[in-house]
Amino acid sequence: PVYEGDSSPVVDIQSGATIGFKYLNFGTEGASKAELTGDIPAGFKISIRIDSYDGKTVSVAEVSEDSKTVVFELGEEITGRHAVYFGFNTENAEDRAVFDCFRFE
């Protein structure tokens, strides 16, 4: 498929997938919430970890209905420079998600 704009979404995400980004600078003021945009089917549980794929979990969101946006409240304010990993899990092995973009505030 061809996508408009400067980026393309990550597609066909299945349970057990992890998508990581190195390195994000949260600055000194930090972030206390995050937002993920895409096509996320109901039943997905998405976790945000920092510093490594099996690092500290800073937030988990359970998607209760098909969503275009998932909002995360971070367990603590994140400051400084960190790698960020989004983990996707669901009990329905047939479900697939699409990850378009994210932001931290």
Q: What annotation goes with each model-predicted range?
A:
Residues P1-E105:
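Extracytoplasmic
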